[in-house]
Structure formats: structure tokens, C-alpha cells
């Protein structure tokens, strides 16, 4: 199981990303707008720098919902590969069966 601090750090990052999503999108639209003047774009870059770095969605990590494991996580289930195997072997995931050919 992952350390609680790492899991909480990711949760804080998710909350920050959600909080600043609209503001980030508006500022990035000005920065990427080719019709905006250089001054407007420069001011937008300064405002963009004032947003916390952890508000960027790219800094989030997908983790297993049960263990917090950061790697080997399946998006479809939100679980790590080890937990998927355990749960699938018990037959608790509908439609998932052990492969045989």
C-alpha cells in the first residue's frame, strides 16, 4: 500500500486542478490567441505563472482505488493490476474471465 501522504498529495492536486481549471483555460486561450497583442499575451503569461504548479492536470497520477499503487493501473477499473487479478479470480468483475485458448 502506498504511503498516505502520497495519496493525499494526489488528492490535493486533483482539488487544485479542479479549482483552477476555468482560470487556466481562460489564460491559455489568451496566450494561444494569435490575434492578441504582444502585451496582452505577456500579461497573460505573468498571470499564468501566478497559478500554482500543482494545479496543472499533468502533475496528477492515476492510482489504484484500493491500494494507492501508482503504476500498473487500469483506467477502465481504476484498480491496480494485482487487485484486478485478485478480484477477477474471485469472479467479482462481470465479464472478466481467465484467458484460455
From Swiss-Prot:
The answer to whether the entry has keyword Coiled coil is: no
Q: Which keywords belong to this entry?
A: Ribonucleoprotein, Ribosomal protein, RNA-binding, rRNA-binding
GO annotations under biological process? translation
Please name the Pfam families in this protein's record.
Answer: Ribosomal_S14 (PF00253)
Q: Name one GO molecular function term.
A: structural constituent of ribosome
A GO CC term assigned to this protein in UniProt: cytoplasm
Q: Which family does it belong to?
A: Belongs to the universal ribosomal protein uS14 family.
Function in brief? Binds 16S rRNA, required for the assembly of 30S particles and may also be responsible for determining the conformation of the 16S rRNA at the A site.
Q: Which PANTHER family match?
A: 30S RIBOSOMAL PROTEIN S14, SMALL RIBOSOMAL SUBUNIT PROTEIN US14M
Assembly behavior: Part of the 30S ribosomal subunit. Contacts proteins S3 and S10.
Q: What is this protein called?
A: Small ribosomal subunit protein uS14
